[in-house]
Design a protein with these regions (language model features):
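Active-site loop segments of alpha/beta catalytic cores
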Residues: 29, 76-324
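Short, basic, glycine/proline-bearing loop/turn elements
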Residues: 1-9, 70-79, 212-217
């Protein structure tokens, strides 16, 4: 398309155009509308640094010098920050592809949002002032509920709570600080909103897979640092679906189309069963992933047996004229 990441994340027409092309080319069963964990942080006063080839990053933390909890009156609304653009794009996507594609509304998980607001001191706070951390996480969990309400009203089918920093803490700390807010959040989505939920985590979250399952999400998504077969065995005990975990850099970005097809075909071949399993990239895909590679990965899901039998030196053809 020739658009930068900043254009995609700030201009509705560019975003919708990109989403529709992704849907046409890759034919996904499920598709996020926006993968930007700084939406809430921006609304709540964090400064952002923008880039052409990735989502923005947080550059300042409003609670860095004060151990306070923001007023609930500051929680995002449909008019806050970039929310009007995002919600409009969600409604347009729901109308365009909602009959064939499950649409994911991605929000920033409580722990990562707390770190956006407080900065790295949040980790020391977990030892020095547990009550403050729990209060701040309570605010961030309320923010997640508010975002969920907005996304569900805009037609989203699945609420994905994305919390990369979960991989940075122990299972004991997870149970002390995160089990309660996450259990309540997923209960809220399941019982009060009748919505599906997903728990996205990045990094090596192996030690936390079981405690994540105990918070009762409908699904979990992990990246390449997790042994997905071992993680699936844990998830199966709790009847939680698991998604992942095509390597983002070595396979999707720097590999060939054949590498992507073979990785997915091999992954599926090692599963004891397909039930409760979602083939997906390990996390948000790098900006420069070749279109052919993602088409190859999708083809291996849609036509698994044909891909297994195919000679690996014959790539699937891509009509470049069809890529806008």
């Amino acid at each position: 398309m020739g658009a930068t990441a900043t254009q995609v994340l700030t201009d509705e027409e560019t975003l919708v155009r990109a989403l529709l092309e992704v849907n046409r080319l890759y034919k996904p069963d499920g598709q996020p509308v926006v993968f930007d964990l700084q939406l809430e942080a921006e609304v709540l006063g964090c400064g952002l640094v923008w880039a052409d080839d990735c989502p923005p990053s947080v550059s300042s933390h409003p609670l860095a010098d004060t151990m306070t909890v923001p007023c609930r009156c500051t929680l995002p609304t449909a008019e806050s920050g970039r929310m009007p653009m995002v919600l409009s794009a969600m409604r347009r996507m729901k109308e365009a592809v909602g009959d064939t594609t499950a649409l994911y509304g991605l929000l920033c998980g409580p722990f990562t949002l707390a770190s956006h607001l407080r900065g790295n001191d949040i980790f020391m706070d977990m030892f020095d002032d547990e009550d403050y951390v729990k209060d701040l996480l309570g605010f961030c969990a309320d923010c997640a509920k508010r975002m969920s309400d907005l996304y569900l009203d805009a037609g989203m089918d699945v609420i994905a709570v994305v919390d990369p920093l979960v991989s940075q803490i122990s299972s004991d700390h997870f149970e002390e600080f995160l089990s309660a807010p996450y259990t309540e959040l997923f209960r809220y989505l399941r019982e009060e909103k009748q919505a599906f939920s997903s728990f996205f985590v990045c990094g090596n979250a192996t030690r936390n897979i079981e405690v994540m399952c105990r918070t009762a999400p409908d699904s979990i998504s992990v990246d390449e640092n997790v042994d997905i077969l071992a993680a699936k065995a844990i998830c199966d005990k709790y009847n939680v679906a698991i998604g992942g975990n095509i390597p983002l850099t070595s396979i999707m970005l720097h590999g060939t189309q054949q590498d992507n097809m073979k990785f997915v075909a091999d992954l599926l071949a090692h599963l004891p069963e397909y039930k409760n399993f979602i083939v997906a990239p390990g996390c948000d895909m790098p900006y420069a992933v070749p279109v052919e590679n993602t088409i190859g990965a999708a083809q291996a899901v849609l036509e698994t047996e044909a891909v297994r039998e195919k000679r690996w030196n014959v790539p699937f053809a891509l009509d470049r004229k069809s890529v806008v």
